[in-house]
A protein has these predicted regions:
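A short, Lys/Arg-rich alpha-helix, primarily the initiator
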Residues: 1-12, 59
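Short alpha-helical DNA-recognition segment
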Residues: 14-33
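DNA major-groove recognition helix of helix-turn-helix/homeodomain DNA-binding modules
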Residues: 25, 43-60
Length: 62
């Protein structure tokens, strides 16, 4: 699930949700909702922006 992978990659890079939000241009509330499982299937463009900010392939967050 993206929620566990997103948090794992974010923490591995030592980023807070706010820092990732700034790097990815995705709202912090959206990131929090994804990580909490409230948005388990984010839009592909959102996943792409998060992956780019985390320097991973989008498939790694799928």
């Amino acid at each position: 699930m993206i929620l566990s992978r997103l948090k794992e990659h974010r923490e591995r890079r030592g980023l807070t949700q706010m820092e990732l939000a700034k790097l990815s241009d995705v709202g912090r509330a959206t990131i929090a909702a994804i990580e909490a499982g409230k948005r388990p299937r984010p839009h592909p463009a959102t996943r792409w922006r998060l992956a780019r900010a985390l320097k991973v392939k989008p498939e790694e967050l799928a």
